[in-house]
């Protein structure tokens, strides 16, 4: 981990391109969009996360003497360029979708408007930060949805792909819905609840399980969750836990947050049997927590089996997004400003794969909500100077399958612009909510989705459409590029 200054958190080619621009001077102001193409885990949406760390990265973006010396030692960069880097700082604008927001493929999550050297340099770090945290926040949202209101504890630090992945992955997991994390440093840095019980080693270090439970319970009577699977859940663990709870009750010690945790075995069967035993002893309000390689699919299955579990510790498969370990965000040039007219000239990247053809121009994104339900009807990508009037009827259509059209009657919908300014002329203009506030925002955001878009198997797609004006720009650019290709072939 390198605190604050992450300027060299970049791919080498960003710096070699910067030197190329420097040696061939240009005053070009450009627009780059960060977006992704496919929802993680085959889901119906993603959660935007990582923006605060992007802002902090921009605020601390400067080359130190040590950075310059290292770059000089690569024998790639010339002295006049290295001297330029000494005074480098970001002067552009950044717009972004706020953290905790539900997002969909192809819409810009982050838009950078800056001199081309600056916009090029920040590509790698923006992708690194946003891809990671958006992935984990999305996975957490899925896991929490499967739990149907039960608390999900993020327990993945020891299995995370290094310290930063553990710290910031836990941050993202809380944004996505987790009630807290086992990572104490994340708790300190972001003021989120830290949670935990004890390990099997605690039990094994005592002469017997009962003594281990009793000692722990006396030390932590207000947070007494006992791990019952060290030896035998039903023959030893649960009976010894009940014995300790009964002794505390007889002594007048108020049991607040108490219960058991099961970390192995048939969680459905064991939880149901443990619940019967606890209830018979008068402890039917005890927490029954489960861990053991959980994810949204296993939790959903356990819920369907009526497992008596009401608290879940999820580690490896959350902090690594085990079944979908990469978010897939990309960063593409979308427009170049004409210095004479001040207008942005749209740029497009073509591909034989139509899904990889970029959307050109300086753009913004509008979310369209149904007035009657509050649910999302569609997202609309527009050119930045376009405004939507919710009193007017509009027709939106799929940018790939253009025959798929939907008419939205005026007066039946509300509109929200998703991209907000976070950096203007190199300075922060945005105050991020706290992580716990972002968690609440994320939960509210997910309530605007239909359940059909949240299911894990074949979710209903939320359409991200292009405005007619933007679609026409894209169509004309594709036709223009096609003509140039034909002219080249004829030559």
Task: List the predicted regions and their residue ranges.
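Buried, small/hydrophobic-residue-enriched core segments of structured protein domains
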Residues: 1-29, 38-40, 76, 82-91, ...
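Gly/Ser/Thr/Ala-enriched C-terminal appendages of enzymes
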Residues: 1-28, 32, 37, 41-43, ...
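N-terminal, Lys/Arg-enriched amphipathic/low-complexity engagement segments
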Residues: 26, 30-86
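An N-terminal, globular interaction/scaffold subdomain
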Residues: 56-60, 96-99, 103
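Short amphipathic C-terminal alpha-helix that caps PH/PH-like domains
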Residues: 58, 122, 126-130, 442, ...
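Short, positively charged
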Residues: 74-82, 162, 394-402
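Short acidic, Pro/Gly- and aromatic-enriched capping/linker segments at domain boundaries
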Residues: 94-100, 413-418
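Structural motif
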Residues: 151-154, 193-196, 223-226, 258-259, ...
């Amino acid at each position: 981990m390198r605190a604050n200054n992450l300027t060299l958190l970049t791919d080498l080619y960003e710096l070699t391109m910067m030197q190329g621009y420097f040696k061939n001077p240009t005053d070009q102001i450009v627009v780059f969009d960060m977006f992704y193409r496919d929802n993680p885990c085959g889901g119906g949406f993603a959660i935007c996360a990582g923006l605060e760390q992007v802002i902090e990265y921009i605020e601390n973006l400067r080359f130190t003497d040590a950075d310059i010396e290292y770059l000089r030692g690569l024998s790639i960069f010339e002295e006049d360029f290295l001297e330029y880097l000494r005074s480098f700082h970001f002067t552009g604008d950044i717009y972004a979708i706020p953290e905790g927001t539900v997002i969909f493929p192809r819409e810009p999550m982050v838009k950078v408007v800056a001199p081309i050297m600056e916009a090029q340099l920040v590509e790698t770090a923006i992708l690194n930060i946003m891809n990671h945290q958006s992935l984990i926040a999305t996975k957490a949202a899925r896991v929490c949805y499967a739990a149907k209101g039960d608390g999900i504890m993020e327990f993945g630090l020891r299995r995370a792909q290094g310290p930063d992945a553990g710290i910031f992955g836990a941050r993202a997991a809380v944004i996505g819905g987790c009630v807290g994390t086992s990572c104490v440093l994340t708790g300190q840095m972001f003021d989120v609840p830290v949670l935990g019980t004890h390990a099997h080693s605690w039990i094994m270090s005592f002469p017997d399980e009962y003594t281990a439970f009793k000692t722990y319970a006396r030390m932590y009577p207000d947070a007494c969750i006992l791990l019952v699977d060290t030896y035998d859940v039903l023959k030893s663990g649960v009976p010894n836990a009940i014995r300790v709870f009964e002794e505390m009750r007889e002594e007048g010690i108020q049991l607040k947050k108490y219960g058991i945790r099961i970390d192995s075995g048939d969680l459905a069967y064991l939880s149901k049997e443990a619940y019967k035993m606890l209830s018979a002893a008068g402890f039917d309000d005890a927490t029954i927590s489960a861990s053991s390689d959980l994810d949204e699919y296993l939790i959903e299955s356990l819920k369907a089996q009526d497992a008596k579990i009401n608290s879940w510790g999820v580690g490896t498969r959350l902090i690594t997004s085990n079944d979908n370990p990469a978010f897939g965000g990309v960063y593409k040039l979308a427009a170049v400003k004409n210095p004479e007219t001040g207008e942005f000239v749209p740029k497009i990247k073509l591909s034989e794969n139509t899904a990889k053809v970029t959307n050109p121009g300086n753009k913004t994104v509008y979310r369209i909500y149904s007035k009657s339900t509050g649910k999302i009807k569609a997202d609309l990508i527009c050119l930045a100077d376009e405004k939507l009037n919710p009193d007017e009827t509009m027709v939106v259509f799929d940018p790939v399958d253009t025959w798929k059209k939907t008419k939205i009657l005026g007066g039946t919908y509300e509109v929200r612009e998703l991209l907000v300014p976070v950096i203007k002329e190199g300075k922060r203009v945005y105050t991020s909510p706290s992580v716990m506030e972002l968690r609440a925002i994320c939960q509210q955001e997910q309530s605007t989705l239909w359940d059909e878009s949240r299911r894990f198997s074949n979710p209903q797609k939320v359409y991200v459409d292009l405005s007619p004006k933007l679609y026409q720009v894209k169509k004309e650019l594709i036709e223009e590029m096609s003509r140039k290709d034909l002219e080249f072939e004829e030559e």
